[in-house]
Each structure stands twice: as C-alpha cells, then as structure tokens.
Amino acid sequence: MPATIDELSRVLRPQMTAVGGKFAYFLEEPVAEEDLRQYLHDPIEALPPTVAELLPRIGIVLAPYLERSSPKAPVTVVSDKPADARLQFSASVNGGDAVTLFFTTREEQVSDYHYYLYDELSTLLASRWPEKARNAWQAMLREELSAEVHGEVDEKSWHLKQALLRKPKSARKEGKQFEEYAARSFADTMTLYLHGICCDIDVESGPRQLPTRYLRKRLELLKGLFPPPEGHAVFPEDLTHHHHRH
C-alpha cells in the first residue's frame, strides 16, 4: 500500500533537514545538490520577511508523484505516474504548529513547482492574514466590484467571483460569500506576487484575466503590506532604482 501523506508527514517530520527560518525538507525523490537551490533556497529566500513571520513551521517533501484515487480518497505518494485525473501536483497536511507540504516533482518544470509551492503558502496566509491586510484587501475588492471589473488572477478566485456576480449588486460586497471570495482572491494574487519576486514570470493574458491596471494596483497593495526582501524586486523598474543606489 502506498503511504498516505498524513502517515508520511508524521514519520518524516523528525527526519527533515533544516533549510533556514521555519523551513525544513525531505527528499522522497532524489534531487541533485545543485538543483536544491532552485527547489528550496531561492523560493524561500525570496519570501518577504512579513510573510515568513505569518507562516507556521513548514516541512517540504519533494515526492515523485502524488495520487488521489478518488475525490474523497486520501492523497498518497507513489513512484509510478498516475493517470492525469488522479495526479495531484501539491497537497498539505496541517499538524497544528507545523504544516507539511507535498509536491509532485518528477517530470515537472521547476517553475511549475514554484507556482504550487507559493499557492500552498498563500492559501495558508489567507487563513492567517492580519486584520490590516484583510481590511485593505476587502476595500480594494469592493472598489473593483463597484467598477464592475471583470476577470481574476486564477481559476479558483474566478469561479468564486462569478458566483458573487450572480447576486444582486447590493449583496455582493459583504457576507460569507464575499469573504470567501476575498480570501481566495488574496491567495491567488499573493501566489502571483510571491512567484514574481522569486522568478521572472509572464502573466498570461486572456478573457478571464484581471485587467493589467487592476492587477498592478493589487500587486502595489501587497508590496506595501508585505515588502520584498532586500535585493528582490516586484516590478521591473524596482530593479533599475536598486542599481542606481549602488
């Protein structure tokens, strides 16, 4: 029987190697020493200090493949590639003061792994965000909804936004559905924000994508709330300013 991630998280916790701050890792899939930097050090060092403070202790398990055999079944670590419908790219186990994150890494691009890593971390942040950040984010979304701005940053928030837009205008800007949408849109935008600080990424444009002007406003808000670490930039022009100072 392949081991479930719940079982593995308990077994592997004491065997993990620290990688700075709150992070530790375990390799279920061999990774070359020179590649570890891309998998672990680079994305962790790119985290804003205020983000790192909010996170619990994090264990990262790089696995060959993750499989969920049915929607209700537990996620397991497997060494043979599952069918596409069963393949999971990331999963998490919340152990109270520590969270263990599992990732499919075989045949996966490092940039895709970074996306799933930041998606998992941003989802954790959305349940731990400080009141100041939540209030500022919700105020910005209310402005977007008033201006009838279409599109979102990623699929999950896009679907929640569509459900919200089916409600009468007066009922869109508060209540449980709005708060659920706000948390997910924060997580999805935060994923993009963190990924952008770490790596040179392209934002896909499409009919579902939030217009550039509004995306920029969101990223500027996140930059103000969670400034990037020294030597890292959010926008291309941040880098030029950085060079001028030296």
Tell me what each language-model feature is.
Residues 143-178, 183-192:
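An amphipathic alpha-helical core segment
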Residues 111, 115, 126-164, 202-209:
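Post-HEXXH active-site segment of zinc metalloproteases
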Residues 122-131, 192, 196:
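Alpha-helix capping at helix-to-loop junctions
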Residues 1-112, 226-245:
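A metal-dependent hydrolase signature that marks the N-terminal structural subdomain at the beginning
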Residues 107-119, 123-124, 180, 184:
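Active-site alpha-helix of zinc metalloproteases
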Residues 1-17, 171-246:
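Pan-zinc metallopeptidase signature
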Residues 35, 39-42, 136, 140, ...:
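Exposed alpha-helical structural elements
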